[in-house]
Amino acid sequence: RDGVFRIGDFFESITGYRTAPAQTSPHEWLMLDEATLAAATNGEVFADPTGQFSKTRQGFKDMPDDVRLALISKRLGMIAQAGQYNLPRSLKRGDGAAAWLSIHEFVNAASSLVFLINVPMVAGYLPYYKWQFAALRKLSKSMFALLPDVAEQLESVMRLSSAACYGGAGFGEGGKGSAPAIDQINGIVEHIAAEIVKELQREHLTTSTETFLEWQRPYIEDHIASNDPVLKSL
């Protein structure tokens, strides 16, 4: 659409909300996916004489920290489920399609986690998938980025995925098959998990050294101040 929007109409057309949900309404924040929040908060503002547009947009960047921690917990769970558990098992039984889908879920969860760790108010949100890696690369190159190496490692996983998932027994130089690619992917996944744990420890969000990330979730959720059940895992 071209033409003039009222400020509230503009944000409502993207998010369904004229202004950001209240800080005390975590269930409303959790209904907004990150790509939607990215669309509402990205882009250059050319003129805002009253400051109202910027104020409204900033409200959508100000995700309550309890919500951010709840999402971090969810992402840790998916990284563990897809990348550390289902992926190696799918590869071991030769189910290339299941392995490929596990990689997809792992990459998305890890990408989201990087943005959440870097805090939406500072880093913004993980955007729509076609801009995902462009945004990750840009964030990773910023001077004070947290987990700056994850983007490159995720791209390595994606480059290796075809050989690992569908290479077969006689694939590759010397007929070594898919085993070398599988070993590399599993190694990268565990390396990313270890980096995440180090960052969680640095931020005093965990005292555990456990690198299977599902077991880090209770430590993260201990820092959620609200008792709202939508913020806690079952």
Positions of the model-derived regions?
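Conserved NTP/Mg2+-binding pocket subregion across the NTase superfamily
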Residues: 1-94
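Residue-level recognition of alpha-helical structural elements
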Residues: 68, 95-99, 125, 178-181, ...
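Amphipathic alpha-helix face/heptad-repeat signature
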Residues: 72-76, 102-103, 185-188, 192
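Short, hydrophobic, well-ordered secondary-structure elements
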Residues: 76-84, 88, 92-118
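Short acidic alpha-helical/loop segments enriched in Asp/Glu that coordinate divalent cations
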Residues: 98-102, 115-136
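Amphipathic alpha-helical interaction surfaces
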Residues: 109-120, 160, 198, 202
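Terminal (often C-terminal) interaction modules
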Residues: 140-234
